[in-house]
Amino acid sequence: MAGLSHPSVFGRATHAVVRAPPESLCRHALRRSQGEEVDFARAERQHQLYVGVLGSKLGLQVVQLPADESLPDCVFVEDVAVVCEETALITRPGAPSRRKEVDMMKEALEKLQLNIVEMKDENATLDGGDVLFTGREFFVGLSKRTNQRGAEILADTFKDYAVSTVPVADSLHLKSFCSMAGPNLIAIGSSESAQKALKIMQQMSDHRYDKLTVPDDMAANCIYLNIPSKGHVLLHRTPEEYPESAKVYEKLKDHLLIPVSNSEMEKVDGLLTCCSVFINKKTDS
């Protein structure tokens, strides 16, 4: 089944939904390994700059949801909704402690008048961080947070697009080591597991994608947007955080490159795509 999205439309967005980080993020957010403690003041500052890029710099209408101290991971809004065109799938996150995060997101997306589909099957789990939409098709990572039933419900929700599953063993999510860096361009990390996942995606797809290989898996998570007044825009990790990967992004001469710091969220496994959900609302003409 061929996807219907046209490359000139891929990456278009009018709105972004974000959520402020709670202080409980520092001690109680889920993390794969215990490492450095999160500097909350710095995390807040980095998040505010991130939101500022989306709103002030790129002109998106930013819907800012408030922090909830009882939901330490609530800043990572990507995991609780998958939006494609006019439809929003409200997910069932793999971690039980995150299930209540969906309520406020559902309310926000209803206000934006999207068609809401809720994942109510108690056997299904899906984190948005495991969902890579290429503009032509979906790849869904099967991880500790996302299962086959979750992928099936996503396929039922977005019937116009092919959906393929990719095993994710060594990372939290599929997008912990890849993302879209352009209409036909997959950014991918250099680790063995990242390269193995890419090979599976290439085998599953009828389409041939270009690839942008970066040395650091975490830095392969970037945000591509197609902003009419700006052209191709790419938010990527800073040279201070990932110098070698930043050099690779700097070779993209037809993109407006915006380095964004994310050191604090990364301590609790949060990457750039994790902190926003993008919506492209059609204007009434």
UniProtKB/Swiss-Prot annotation:
Positions of modified residues (Phosphoserine): 33
Please give the residue positions where the record annotates the modification S-nitrosocysteine. 222, 274
Q: Which GO terms describe its molecular function?
A: amino acid binding; dimethylargininase activity; metal ion binding
Q: Which tissues express it? A: Detected in red blood cells (at protein level). Widely distributed, high amounts found in kidney, brain, aorta and pancreas.
EC no. given is 3.5.3.18
For the keyword Amino-acid biosynthesis, the answer is: no
Family per record: Belongs to the DDAH family.
Subunit (UniProt): Monomer.
**What is the official name of this protein in its record?**
N(G),N(G)-dimethylarginine dimethylaminohydrolase 1
Which species does the entry assign this protein to? Rattus norvegicus
